[in-house]
Amino acid sequence: MRLRHLSDPDSLPALDKSFAIERPALGLAPDAPPVRILLLYGSLRARSFSRLAVEEAARLLQFFGAETRIFDPSDLPLPDQVQSDDHPAVKELRALSEWSEGQVWCSPERHGQITSVMKAQIDHLPLEMAGIRPTQGRTLAVMQVSGGSQSFNAVNTLRLLGRWMRMFTIPNQSSIAKAFQEFDAAGRMKPSPYYDRIADVMEELVRFTALVRPHREALTDRYSERKAAGHVIDEATDLSSIAIAPQPLPESETS
């Protein structure tokens, strides 16, 4: 499995738990299993700050009641490099995306844009394959790390890509400036407003994912696709047709 092992998953030294809601989605949706979140990062360096930021996000997500998986892209081929996408890393990435109900994308900003490592992962996720939609209807949180001053070029691009992949990108986002100053020697993020923003984003992602989950099929049901597939609407069973159909007046109002 190409999954990153998350060290110290329950250790949150930068989080003041006296202000943290441990299950922020309670009451927003029917009680259900933990929301499933896939996290992607955009650098293969041994001390990758996008990976370290994603690991902090995963710890917070687990504290907030989510189930997380972090994909390791270290042996992912370039798009179109392998015939018919027949590569175990590609297959595993797609399976993880299908498993997910929400995702976190975190890229370094390099030359004003996301990295090729980040883009390659997204490019390996088709809108549809054999009737399966690996990204459509999922929620998405976007993050970036920068070596210099704070910027938003990468998160803006990730938002654009999320819309292209027909995902529901949440309003909040995280951009960490001078990321090399924000992590200690052990790779843990120091307490800071940047860490607090990641906590905000993950809390919001859990809530939005819980809200969207029961309605994902309805939210991605499209006229053009029904038309192309020849799926004719049966007005006798279609709930929307029943709801807007003229209703007979009660006898007291017709007499």
Curated annotation (Swiss-Prot):
Statement: the UniProt record of this protein carries the keyword RNA-binding: no
UniProt-listed Pfam families: FMN_red
Coiled-coil residues: none
Matching InterPro entries: Arsenate-R_ArsH (IPR014063), Flavoprotein-like_sf (IPR029039), FMN_Rdtase-like_dom (IPR005025)
Domain of life: Bacteria
Keyword Nucleotide-binding: yes
GO biological process, one term: protein homotetramerization
Keyword terms, alphabetized: Flavoprotein, FMN, NADP, Nucleotide-binding, Oxidoreductase
UniProt-annotated binding residues for FMN: S43, L44, R45, A46, R47, S48, F49, S50
E.C. number(s) listed in UniProt: 1.-.-.-
Needed cofactors: FMN
Signal peptide: none
Class of this enzyme: oxidoreductase
Transmembrane segments: none
MF annotations from Gene Ontology: azobenzene reductase activity; FMN binding; FMN reductase (NADPH) activity; oxidoreductase activity, acting on NAD(P)H, quinone or similar compound as acceptor
Family: Belongs to the ArsH family.
Subunit structure: Homotetramer.
UniProt-listed NCBIfam families: resist_ArsH
UniProt protein name: NADPH-dependent FMN reductase ArsH
Biological source species: Shigella flexneri
